[in-house]
Regions:
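Active-site-adjacent structural elements that line small-molecule/cofactor binding pockets in enzymes
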Residues: 1-330
Length: 330
């Protein structure tokens, strides 16, 4: 029998913090396991948002996603996660990631030596969360100290997409999360690399991905809700392999230019229904359910709903996922 598939819901910090309680209640009622709270510079801060979410529910978990060691020191990230876990035991997870290149550039930060920096960040956080005194002398971090709140052995994830980072996730992290807009074929490719890291580290990690979701009785209306959000993601050149493996025809340069010019008609025309269907769980409940199964078959343990924040629409998406089969669980 297949292991239970967990449902998560992503929060990107663009909506008012006052909406978090309702979002948490909706996700909790639908049986979601976690809210994944993104750390995007200039948006709502995820640690404060996590406290609000955890206060609004008795069982929903919170993942601090993807805390960048270039903007948040790993000691501070571990402090935040441990403090939240002290308040809400067993419901907190920590996720590291490099961070969006454009956002780092906007604050004058260069993400140098990313693989080694993330490797050391995972090691530092895990040692601190053990509750023991830490003396760490790496090439990127030097730490001497101990968390005042003692041991909080919570999961440490890594957000990854490139081969070296994916392999690092399998070797060192407790879980890997793959970004939104990725196709089942690309996720399968990613997880094969993660497994190489698992073999080297002699361990197994959990596997999650942000999946753009939209459900409606009218297929096209479902696609329209997520078309521009997906287009924004796929315009990046780093999605070239993702598009190739999915067999997707998309002119990324033209799409990036259309965004820069705010030519929304052109953005919509370039991001065809075929593109949406290959990179989202979108359409009628039956169509979306088939894509959820494809993502699951690629090897995911948790599907994190991305891009759906209006409560009624989120209700519909979570209901569709809950009806997937009997093995959806926390």
């Amino acid at each position: 029998m297949a292991a239970p598939l967990q449902i998560g819901v992503s929060v990107d910090g663009t909506d008012p913090a006052s909406s978090l309680r309702a979002l948490a209640e909706t996700a909790d009622a639908a049986g979601a396991a976690n809210l994944w709270l993104a750390c995007h510079l200039f948006n709502r801060e995820p640690i404060a948002c996590a406290a609000a979410v955890l206060s609004a529910s008795r069982s929903l978990g919170a993942v601090l996603m993807a805390m960048s060691p270039y903007t948040v020191h790993p000691v501070y990230a571990a402090m935040a996660a441990a403090t939240l876990d002290e308040l809400f035991p067993g419901r907190v997870q920590l996720c590291f990631g490099v961070g969006a290149p454009a956002a780092l550039e906007a604050v004058g930060v260069a993400a140098e030596h990313p693989v080694e920096t993330l490797r050391e960040s995972i090691e530092v956080a895990r040692e601190l969360l053990s509750g023991e005194p830490v003396k760490f002398a790496g090439t990127r971090h030097r730490i001497s100290g101990r968390l005042a709140m003692g041991a909080h052995r919570l999961p440490v994830w890594l957000a990854a997409s490139g081969p070296r980072m994916l392999e690092l996730a399998g070797e060192k992290a407790d879980g890997v999360v793959i970004s939104a807009g990725t196709s089942p074929a690309f996720i399968g490719w990613c997880l094969n690399i993660v497994r190489r890291g698992e073999e080297r580290g002699g361990r197994a990690v959990r596997k999650a991905a942000l999946v753009v979701c939209s459900v409606d009785a009218d297929t096209r209306r479902a696609h329209e809700r997520v078309r521009r959000r997906l287009a924004y993601v796929l315009r990046g050149s780093h999605h070239a392999r993702n598009l190739q493996l999915a067999g997707t025809r998309l002119d990324q340069a033209a799409l990036a230019e259309a965004f820069a010019q705010e030519d929304w008609q052109r953005v919509d025309a370039l991001t065809t229904d075929d593109v949406v269907m290959r990179h989202c769980a979108s359409g009628t409940p039956h169509e979306a359910r088939a894509m959820v199964q494809a993502y699951r078959d690629a090897g995911l343990d948790e599907i994190v709903v991305y891009g759906m924040y209006e409560r009624r629409q989120l209700d519909d998406v979570l209901a569709m996922m809950r009806s997937q089969d009997a093995s959806i669980g926390r």
